[in-house]
């Protein structure tokens, strides 16, 4: 009946609001190829709010890429949309969460210098410009190294004699870059490590 349905819905809403106010939540943000999604779950893993941001990579100078501004704006946009959803559903302002996780494209090439400057535009997983490197690495390791893997991009840059290679301090994936942007720490998750090499 309508009364029990309304009561059940109100109870669930009250539990979600309590979880938000007590930081009994986890926020996951996923950088997909065309959309960045933010999902807030409670301590029982129930989705309680979400937000998203549409984005699209561009083909510039022979490379599929997103700019650092695209990444920052997308992160902010998806989070802002989530905050709005929380406010509309529960009437509270989201100011903190219990845990945060980032997921993003595990392949690609983002080399940085010692000062933290990106040396070349982010080369996404869509690029298939590393055929020579991929073949040579396959021969060397007797293991398939797909063109999208970061090591193939790095080795191709070396084979091409690209100027930036001498200035590389570290390289990372998009997920690791977002993690560093948020925390200041250089961390690479196990899934991303598999995509680098």
Protein language model regions, located:
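Conserved donor sugar-nucleotide recognition element shared by glycan-biosynthetic enzymes
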Residues: 68-71, 75, 130, 150-153
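Hydrophobic packing residues within well-ordered alpha-helices of enzyme cores
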Residues: 134-137, 157
